[in-house]
């Protein structure tokens, strides 16, 4: 039957109306399409961030800049919650994995989260450096960008959250539309997790109130599928037992002595010497020398050594008990990503035990965020209610969990009266427990005098709580285990480690390491005077500096004055490298002076490095007038600030200016590299 014009008009009108209706619902119905339209996918450059979003049908991008893994962990957890609560199609991305030349072409239907840490003296993390350069120097208009930023920083540092604030400012200046308030966390006050949770709540409010998203009940949806492989065992050559990466599993024909070595691929360095530096019975500090002669790994004086950790036997046993895995540690599992943008964070197939020992951060303090996320898997309703209550109240969480220094297993077993949490999927743990990341140590040797070895100096973090639980640092206790075994001291360590490693690859005292470059460097002109300030293990890189100048003198090079201010508790118990300093003085002569502050030597008077600086203000002022560069290493929370205040006081007096003006002058020296810090 033929259609007349009126019928045709009505049909066309209905089609348009229906299309508009579904288009509107597609935009607003988060359960079906998460609130944003998606463009067609297409093939192209794998480093093209926009192509990746289109190809994988994503409408929410979370970019992280992370040095220690915390920002990455936050990004992953937020991604899962955005998907579960609001149906957003999320993609977590490492800045370093993509190019951003066409980032200005991003469309308004994409939400972008920047979760970025500040590293060092207001610098971006290594993986965010190229994006930072692009945003600062090359980016044009970003008028179609919808974004928000969370910065991770430490208020004890001079440039607190500089990168988060800079990103937020530049993105706005270039036309971006911030859909949720900027947020920042402060590790210096110990409130990083709480700050993130507060910001996350604000983001969710913005999504609901400003962007009209409907919030759903939070439900765990795994990104990975886990299969237990009964047909495989740890003896199969393709099964990971905790090797750093695939190259170390399938190492036949692969030269593992050639770099580049970085956070994705370490060198297995042999520890050739260890030494206990303290004489105290209850405190320990180890000197460790890594042999790099078998590789092309290089360093320069002042760099950092990254040591790849593993967990202690005791913490592994407790974690396995908590989740009912005691009899499954040798069982092989295979993981497959259910989302095309999710990357399995370690080689697999792999055993449960290898994941727990080498890849999960099980020894550190449990966060309130994790508490809330795991409550639904509690072994009984009473524990679930208790967990939800404690996790929902930051004061109660602080008093009942944080102050007791509970790790994950400690907290869960305490709350459940030692009933195992057997209903927690292992996939959940892989996705929600932060992954083990390298620990960084200031190198205490000189690349001029120790070309083939790298020295580190580490105080062993170990204490026993009132209930008898050991609270231990991961790497420092591993190093202490090696020192005890290598020197056959007969001591009993607080916790124990597998020193042989996967398939015996760590035997004969080897550990995976890589070098991270640092800007904490001696002046290129060797005659420039230097003022070195480093109490405790803060003296580590300064020892390297002094050794460098000693070697320069031996090589016939003229050097400037070196003045070292060192501090410790007691001259007889924890004076680091006590015998060495006189040897250095004999070589450097009048170009070396050392002043020691002992905070607990005299019970009636505590003396700190800043006191010694003020006592020798005339010398300090003379050196500053001669163009001396100041180097400070150690505790950022108090020491670094007190030292800076002491220097400002000396400057104010010598130049007859107000201390506030002197403080600003000293602060400006940091920008000029006349005042350098390596603090934590």
UniProtKB/Swiss-Prot annotation:
Cofactor note: Binds 1 FAD per monomer.
Cell compartment(s), UniProt: Endoplasmic reticulum membrane; Mitochondrion outer membrane; Cell membrane
Cofactors that this protein relies on: FAD; FMN
Binding site for FAD: 439-442, 457-459, 473-476, 680
Record topological domains on the Cytoplasmic side: 24-680
Positions with a binding annotation for NADP(+): 283, 537, 599-600, 606-610, 642
Membrane topology designation: Single-pass membrane protein
Catalytic function, reaction form: 2 oxidized [cytochrome P450] + NADPH = 2 reduced [cytochrome P450] + NADP(+) + H(+)
Binding site for FMN: 66-71, 117-120, 152-161, 187
Lumenal compartment residues: 1-5
Flavodoxin-like domain mapped to chain residues: 60-204
HAMAP family linked to this entry: NCPR (MF_03212)
Family: Belongs to the NADPH--cytochrome P450 reductase family.
Function according to Swiss-Prot or TrEMBL: This enzyme is required for electron transfer from NADP to cytochrome P450 in microsomes. It can also provide electron transfer to heme oxygenase and cytochrome B5. Involved in ergosterol biosynthesis.
Record-given protein name: NADPH--cytochrome P450 reductase
Native source organism of the sequence: Candida tropicalis
Gene name of the encoded protein: NCP1
């Amino acid at each position: 039957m033929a259609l007349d014009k009126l019928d045709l008009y009505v049909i066309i009108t209905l089609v348009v109306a229906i299309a508009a209706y579904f288009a509107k619902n597609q935009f607003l119905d988060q359960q079906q399409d998460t609130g944003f339209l998606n463009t067609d996918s297409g093939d192209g450059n794998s480093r093209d961030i926009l192509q990746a979003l289109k190809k994988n049908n994503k409408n929410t991008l979370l970019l992280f800049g992370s040095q220690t893994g915390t920002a990455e962990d936050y990004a992953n957890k937020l991604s899962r919650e955005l998907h579960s609560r609001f149906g957003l199609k999320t993609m977590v991305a490492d800045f370093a994995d993509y190019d951003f030349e066409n980032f200005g072409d991003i469309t308004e239907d994409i939400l972008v989260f920047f979760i970025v840490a500040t590293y060092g003296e207001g610098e971006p993390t290594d993986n965010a450096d190229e994006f930072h350069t692009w945003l600062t120097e090359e980016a044009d208009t970003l008028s179609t960008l919808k974004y928000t930023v969370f910065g991770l920083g430490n208020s004890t540092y001079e440039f607190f959250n500089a990168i988060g604030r800079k990103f937020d400012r530049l993105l706005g200046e270039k036309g971006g539309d911030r859909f949720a308030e900027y947020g920042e966390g402060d590790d210096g006050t110990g409130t990083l997790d709480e700050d993130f949770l507060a910001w996350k709540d604000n983001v969710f409010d913005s999504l609901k109130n400003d962007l009209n998203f409907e919030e759903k009940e939070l439900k765990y949806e795994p990104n990975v599928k886990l299969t237990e492989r009964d047909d495989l065992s740890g003896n199969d050559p393709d099964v990971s037992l905790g090797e750093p990466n695939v190259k170390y599993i399938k190492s036949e024909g692969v030269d593992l002595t050639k770099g580049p070595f970085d956070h994705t691929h370490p060198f297995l360095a042999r520890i050739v010497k260890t030494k206990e530096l303290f004489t105290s019975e209850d405190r320990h500090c180890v000197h460790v020398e890594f042999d790099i002669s078998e590789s092309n790994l290089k360093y320069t004086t002042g760099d950092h050594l990254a040591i790849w950790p593993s967990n202690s036997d005791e913490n592994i046993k407790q974690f396995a008990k908590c989740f009912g895995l005691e009899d499954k540690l040798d069982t092989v599992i295979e993981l497959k990503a259910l989302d095309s943008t999710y990357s399995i964070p370690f080689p697999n197939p792999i055993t449960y035990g290898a994941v727990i020992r080498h890849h999960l951060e099980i020894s550190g303090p449990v966060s309130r965020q994790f508490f809330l996320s795991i409550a639904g898997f509690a072994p009984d309703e009473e524990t679930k209610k208790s967990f939800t209550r404690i996790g929902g109240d930051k004061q109660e969480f602080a008093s009942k969990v944080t102050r007791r220094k509970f790790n994950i297993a400690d907290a869960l077993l305490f709350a459940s009266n030692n009933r195992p949490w057997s209903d927690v999927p292992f996939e959940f743990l892989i996705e929600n427990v932060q992954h083990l990341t390298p620990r960084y140590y200031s190198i205490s040797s000189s690349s001029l005098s120790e070309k083939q070895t790298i020295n580190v100096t580490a105080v062993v973090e170990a204490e026993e709580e009132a209930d008898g639980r050991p609270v231990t640092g991961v790497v420092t206790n591993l190093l202490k285990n090696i020192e005890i075994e290598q020197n056959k001291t007969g001591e009993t360590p607080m916790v124990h480690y597998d020193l042989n490693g996967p398939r015996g690859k760590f035997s004969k005292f080897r550990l995976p390491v890589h070098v991270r470059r640092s800007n904490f460097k001696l002046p290129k002109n060797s005659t420039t005077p230097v003022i070195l300030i480093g109490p405790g293990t803060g003296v580590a890189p300064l020892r390297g500096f002094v050794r460098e100048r000693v070697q320069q003198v031996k090589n016939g090079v003229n050097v400037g004055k070196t003045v070292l201010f060192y501090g410790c508790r007691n001259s007889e118990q924890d004076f680091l490298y006590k015998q060495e300093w006189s040897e250095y003085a004999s070589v450097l002569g009048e170009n070396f002076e050392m002043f020691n502050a002992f905070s607990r030597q005299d019970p009636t008077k505590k003396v700190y490095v800043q006191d010694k600086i003020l006592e020798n203000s005339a010398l300090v002022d003379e050196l500053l007038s001669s163009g001396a560069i100041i180097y400070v290493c150690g505790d950022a929370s108090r020491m670094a600030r007190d030292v800076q205040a002491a220097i400002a006081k000396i400057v104010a007096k010598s130049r007859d200016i107000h201390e506030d003006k002197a403080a600003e002058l000293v602060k400006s020296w940091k920008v000029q590299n006349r005042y350098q810090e390596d603090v934590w």
